[in-house]
Amino acid sequence: MMQRGESLITRARNNCVAKFLENKEWTHLFWIDSDIGFSPDSFYRLLLADKDVVAGVYPLKRENWPEAGLPAGMTQADFERMYTSYTVNTNDKNENGEIVLKVDEEGFMKVHDAPTGFMVIKRSVFEKMMAAYPELNYISDSDYNREDKGLH
């Protein structure tokens, strides 16, 4: 399912979730933003991970240029490795207060929030949220004739 011409990303995602929930045979919702590059292997890795929510890591759209300038002879690969920020946020810190990335044997890690540009969510997550938070029932403000089907 594609969302085109929607300038408000939150509304576009909410409309996608509502459409997803209308189709009972769909088991996973996979967000892939149009500006995210990924390999087919990465796609299948997330889809088959059997996690309630799982997201791929990708670079933020900014570089952290060093204040002193670039070292002589630096290659693009060196620059990307040293100065690119990624969409990883965790609260895990060691005794010195330094952030520690705890990666499991499958190459995944728990985070306190994750980017939605390359993310898979199981249907059961939405069903649990609907049961726990019925007051968050979603009605699109972009489709005034849309029937309220009780979907979030």
Question: Where are the regions that the model predicts?
Answer:
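Short beta-strand-to-loop acidic/aromatic patch adjacent to the donor-nucleotide binding site
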Residues: K24-G37
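Short, conserved alpha-helix that lines the donor NDP-sugar binding/gating region
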Residues: I9-E22
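Alpha-helix termini
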Residues: F20-W26, Y133
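Short beta->alpha junction loops
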Residues: M2-I9
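Residue-level detector of alpha-helix boundaries and kinks
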Residues: M1-M2, E106
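Glycine-/small-residue-rich active-site loops that bind phosphorylated ligands and cofactors
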Residues: L8, G37-F38
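Conserved catalytic core of nucleotide-sugar-dependent glycosyltransferases
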Residues: V17, S39-L151
